[in-house]
Each structure stands twice: as structure tokens, then as C-alpha cells.
Amino acid sequence: MDWTPIWHQAAAPAFALGFLAGKKKTVVYSVISQVSGEKLRIRFSNHYGKKPYTIGGLTVWAQGEMHTVTRDGSCVFTVPAGESCYSDALTLPVTMGEELEIRLYYASKVMDSNMIEENAVSYQGNHTTDSELPPPRREKYMEQYGLYEAIPGMDQIEVFTGQPSKIIVAFGDSITALNRWVKPLQRRLFDAYGGDYTLMNAGISGNCLLYDVPGLMGASYGEKGVSRFERDVLRFSGLCGVILALGVNDVAYYSQKTGAVISLEQYGSAVTDIVDRLHKAGVRVIAQTLPPRSGFVKKGYTPEMEALRVSINEWIRDSALFDYMVDADALLRDPKNPSFTDERYHQGDHLHPNQAGGMLMAQAYDLQKLTGEA
């Protein structure tokens, strides 16, 4: 018997974006357990916090019944500054494929946050024990920019099981965090292998591999991938595979000023180091090429940036480093204008895949090559 994760998100500082911080609201979302087990526990993160934060209530709803989650026996508890901690183990028989609803009330502001669940909604006040929920609130800017409700502080959900999963981590940016290719791929793995393999999402919106974006807004994009790699990827027990899907944001910050940090040479060196570390640990590495970015309205995109993206993709395709490669660029690009995403496959901003684009990416994976079962 051992603990195995069924849900995970990587954390970034929320102080630049108040709507991420969660104070005095309840966040509700659902997860599917890929394994059967006897107990459940939840891990909380306060990596970026300068002071403790308080969870004012946490419940798990399974088959219409409420189960209260505690820490040190208390329904109200704090998460220490600069640390992670677990809840008490909740005795709760969980069946493979079962849907669990998580309700979390924040009594204070939380610094660690992310938004990876399209089904997440929020309510003002504490609604963790309500038998019926009121209509959820949804900010207009979320729909406008394709954002999800944030789930502050919650880091991982684990089930105590006799059949621990082998873990594959999707290490990426918003294209990963939005879950439009990760969840369909996770479902394909589940349908093919049951709980033998689980795909965890370690994407952070705006994240770069090589570059820490400056300013308060930049901080909310998380530490650069080379810095967060150990915390967000290597610490997984049972890690067997990593999908590398970072770099398209680095390209957008390329200039004469950043050229010493963001270049094909720096990208290749950083990726080679990551792959070497993973291979030494017996972990398979899967590369994704960088998708088209031209037309993305939030940043000017220069010919030099596009040339760098193209050269990085050529390097990925030609490299013998990887155990497997999926060509996201070739899948998503407009055949008549290959620096742009095909109009059928983006959410309206010319960068982020819509449901059809995400499904196309997920279906492109050969599961035997992904898992190493081939």
C-alpha cells in the first residue's frame, strides 16, 4: 500500500493578481480518481507565502455524501509560511473512475495559486457544507481571456492504494495548464491502462523555460522552468515519464537585451541538462515542439522571434536526446501560413488550443511510445 497522486497543480505567486488569492470565498471543483483506495489526503503549498494562511473549511463530496477533511484534527487550520503540509488522512473508500467534488473555503489570502480546472467555480463565503450550492460567480474577464477559476494553495490530492500509479508529468506553460490536451490524454491513458499510469499537470500560465519574466505580473507566471523543475517534476514518487512542453513564451521575450539568456544555444543546453538528469533517474522524456504564435494579440511578435521558434523546433525534431517526440507545431499550424495556428484549433487568440486543438494533440500521442510499453 502506498500514496499515489490523482490530481496535481504547480504553484506560482498570486500577489500580482488578486483574483487568484482566494480570500473569503469557496472554490468548488471535481476530479476523477484513476485508482481505487481506502484513504485520501490533500497537500497544501505555501512556498511563496511570507506568513501562514488559514483554511476555513474543506470537504470532499463522494456519491452525494459529505466528508470533512481536517489537519491535526481541526476543520480550521493554517499552512505554515514557506512550507507544504498534508491534511490528516481521510478514511474514504474510493473507486477507480469515481468523481470526487472538492470544496475549499479560504479564510485568508493565499500566495500560492494556479488555474488548471475548467470545471472550477467559486462562491462568496463558506459553502463547504451546503447540501445545495447557489449559482456560482464567474468574472467576465475569465471568459474574455480563456481563464479558469483559481484554486489557491491546493497542491496535490493523493489516494492510499494497493496499486500505485506510474507518474507522467506534463511540464509546460498555459497551453499545458489549460488542460485541453492534458485531460484528453489522461483519459486515453486511463482507458488503455486503468490506473497503471497517471498524467499530472505541472503547467503554469505564462511560464518560460529560461527566463524569469520581470515585474509583479511576471512573478505570477512562476519561476522559470529550469528553476522549478526539481520541485514540480523530480519530487514525484513513481515518476516514469516527463513531457517537455516549455519554450513558446521564451520566444516571445527574445530581443537584443535578452539574447544572452534566450537563444537556441541556451535552450538546447537547458533541455539537454534536464534530459540527462531524467535519464539518470530512469525516466523517459517526451518532447513537444513549440506551437505557432503569430497573431497572438497580447504581445508584438517579431520575425526574429518566429525565426527562433522555427530553429528550436528544428532542433527538437532532429535531436536524438528524446525517447519520443510529438510535433505540436505540425499538428496545429495553418498549412497555408505556418507561423499561425489553424483557425479551427485555437480559442480565438491565435495561441491557445481550443477543445478541438487539444483533442488533436492528445490523439497524436502513441500511448505505447509515451509509456515505454512498446
Write out the residue ranges for each language-model feature:
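Short, well-ordered coil/turn elements that cap or connect secondary structure elements
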Residues: Q163, G194, K280, S319-A320
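Surface-exposed amphipathic alpha-helices with a cationic face
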Residues: V271-G282
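Conserved SGNH/GDSL esterase-like catalytic core that processes O-acyl groups on lipids
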Residues: V28, L58, I157, S165-A270, ...
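N-terminal secretory targeting modules
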Residues: M1-F171, A177, K183, F190-G194, ...
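A cross-domain feature marking catalytic cores of carbohydrate-active enzymes
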Residues: L246, T289-L290
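Catalytic His-Asp segment of secreted/periplasmic serine-dependent ester chemistry enzymes
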Residues: A252, L290-A374
